[in-house]
C-alpha cells in the first residue's frame, strides 16, 4: 500500500488565525502522494506534468486551475518546467466564505478548469498582492487578503461563464485543447481543425509549444495514457479494450508506450490498485 504524506496547516500558515497563504513553486519538482488539512487552488502558470488526483490521472499544463479539497490525495509526476501558484486556504477561518463558496466548485461539479492567457496574466498580479498581504498578521492585511482572494475566485468563475455563453469568444488555443480532449479514442487531424477555424497549421503548432512546452502529439499522448491509467485502476476492462478506448489499435504498442511513461506494464500498474 502506498504511503501518503500528511501535510499540516501549521507548516504553511503564518498563524493559527491566518485564513490564506500563497506557496509558489517555480519550478515544482516531482512531489509524492500527499494530503493536507486545508484546501488549495493550484494555478499552473507554465510547463507541464501529470497530476495524480484521488482515483484519476490528468495531464496538466499552462492555464489549468485545480480545486483541491482537504483530504484529497494527489501528487505531481513527469514534470517539465512546471510552475505552480498554490493558494492555500482554510474555509473555517474565512469570514467571507459564505460568499466565496458560490465561486468554488463543490460536490460533483468540475474541479479542473482551463483559463486563457489573458486571465492568467491578470491572476499573476493578484496572486503577487495576495502573497504579500497573507504573510502579515494584522487584521487589515487579513481582511485585504480575503478581498483579493474573493477577486481571484470571481475572475476565474467569470471567465468560465463568458466562455460557456459564446464559443466564439474562446481563444483558438482553448478550442484546440477542447478538441484534443474529445479525440482520446479517435484520430485527431490538425489540418482539419485549422481549416475549420481558419488557422495556419505552423502557427498553431508554434503557439501550442510555447504555451505548454510540448508538441500537440505529445500532449494528446499524455491525455490518452492518463485516461488509460485511470481506467486500469478503476475498472476490470481488458488491457486490449482500454487500449482501443484510448486511441491505440495495437495493444502491444500501447503497452510499450505506457511502460515508457509509468515504468511498468499496464497489468503491473493495475495490480498496484487491486485490493488484497
Swiss-Prot record:
The keyword Cytoplasm applies. The gene is rhaR. Keywords: Activator, Cytoplasm, DNA-binding, Repeat, Rhamnose metabolism, Transcription, Transcription regulation. This is HTH-type transcriptional activator RhaR. It is found in: Cytoplasm. HAMAP family: HTH_type_RhaR (MF_01533). The keyword Flavoprotein does not apply. SUPFAM superfamilies: Homeodomain-like, Regulatory protein AraC. The lineage of its organism: Bacteria, Pseudomonadati, Pseudomonadota, Gammaproteobacteria, Pasteurellales. Coiled coil: none annotated.
Amino acid at each position: 500500500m502506498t504511503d501518503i504524506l500528511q501535510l499540516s496547516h501549521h507548516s504553511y500558515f503564518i498563524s493559527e488565525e491566518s485564513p490564506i497563504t500563497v506557496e509558489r513553486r517555480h519550478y515544482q519538482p516531482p512531489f509524492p502522494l500527499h494530503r493536507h488539512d486545508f484546501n488549495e487552488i493550484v494555478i499552473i502558470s507554465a510547463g507541464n506534468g501529470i497530476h495524480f488526483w484521488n482515483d484519476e490521472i490528468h495531464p496538466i499544463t499552462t492555464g489549468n486551475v485545480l480545486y483541491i479539497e482537504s483530504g484529497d490525495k494527489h501528487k505531481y509526476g513527469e514534470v517539465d518546467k512546471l510552475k505552480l501558484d498554490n493558494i492555500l486556504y482554510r474555509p473555517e477561518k474565512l469570514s467571507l466564505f459564505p460568499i466565496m463558496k458560490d465561486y468554488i466548485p463543490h460536490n460533483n461539479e468540475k474541479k479542473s478548469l482551463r483559463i486563457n492567457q489573458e486571465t492568467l496574466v491578470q491572476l499573476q498580479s493578484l496572486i503577487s498582492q495576495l502573497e504579500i498581504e497573507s504573510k502579515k498578521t494584522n487584521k487589515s492585511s487579513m481582511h485585504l487578503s480575503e478581498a483579493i482572494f474573493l477577486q481571484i475566485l470571481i475572475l476565474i468563475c467569470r471567465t468560465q461563464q463568458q466562455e460557456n455563453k459564446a464559443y466564439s469568444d474562446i481563444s483558438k488555443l482553448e478550442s484546440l485543447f477542447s478538441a484534443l480532449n474529445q479525440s482520446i479514442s479517435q484520430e485527431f487531424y490538425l489540418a482539419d481543425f485549422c481549416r475549420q477555424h481558419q488557422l495556419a497549421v505552423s502557427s498553431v503548432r508554434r503557439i501550442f509549444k510555447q504555451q505548454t512546452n510540448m508538441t500537440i502529439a505529445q500532449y494528446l499522448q499524455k491525455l490518452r495514457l492518463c485516461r488509460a491509467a485511470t481506467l486500469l485502476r478503476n475498472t476490470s476492462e481488458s488491457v486490449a479494450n482500454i487500449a482501443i478506448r484510448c486511441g491505440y489499435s495495437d495493444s502491444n504498442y500501447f503497452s510499450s508506450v505506457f511502460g515508457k511513461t509509468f515504468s511498468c506494464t499496464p497489468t503491473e500498474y493495475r495490480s498496484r490498485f487491486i485490493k488484497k
